[in-house]
Amino acid sequence: MRTLLSLFALTLFIPASGAAQIRASEIGTMSQMIDGTKITMEYSRPRVRGRDPLFGTPIVRWDEVWTPGANWATTFETNKDMTLGGQRVPKGKYSMWIVVRQSGNWTTILDPVVRRYHMEPPDSSAQQIRIPVRPTEGPFFEVLTWSVPDITATGGTLAMNWGKTVVSMPIAVDPSFQMTMSAAEAAPYVGRYEYVRRLQPDSGQKSTLFVTHENNTLKGRWEPNDPYFRTFALIRIAPHWFAPGVYDRTGAIYEVYKPEMTFEFTVTGGRASSLEVRTEDDKVEATGKRLP
């Protein structure tokens, strides 16, 4: 009887085949879209577990070619050509590695062979993309984490946090629209327009829209001034069609209202005479008529 009870108790502690298990380094994914460019990373997420320091020890030795994760190599994938840390990255999927050093820059490596185990780092090759990075100190992260902590209309920052170590690389994507415009291209639109709102609750409200050309950009502003848009970029999305781009306080465009808001100019004889502002469901939100 005692033997039967012992066998029954033992079976309680034997995991069933295929049952879920807690891993030392769980799989994590990170995905971010920036103006149509999708960046995806997949990686195992080691924990600190009281180990300090992490680098320059048997955990990650100096001059080691280390995958910033665990188990199978961390992967980086982009659906379009883009720039990472100043280096051009063709669209595709790569395994990611970092050469860690006691002083000076570290080196991020994107290798075209995706499926590699973390104990089998790649040899140096001409097909690799190498990006110098400077490790810094930041807030403590128990679990290794990849993220895009800040984003602009044309890029952002890719960052790894583990313990108090931060590795970050600037991201730049190819814009899907033309941000700049020459003076000759802008000339037909520059001027003042009587601007009349057509949708409730502002129906019939009038203001003046000023269209100018500054710093190789077509810009607009309303008088009285709109506290949110202030001075905004008019970004060409089709012939005579523009979407407003909103600036942050540093002068960088951080949001483009496409397709929520479209300025459609009517050009006759090389000069815009009027405009309509349409919503994404093609309703006329406002109209404008050129003033003398």
Where are these regions (language model features)?
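A short, compositionally biased
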Residues: 23-28, 76-78, 102-104, 152-156, ...
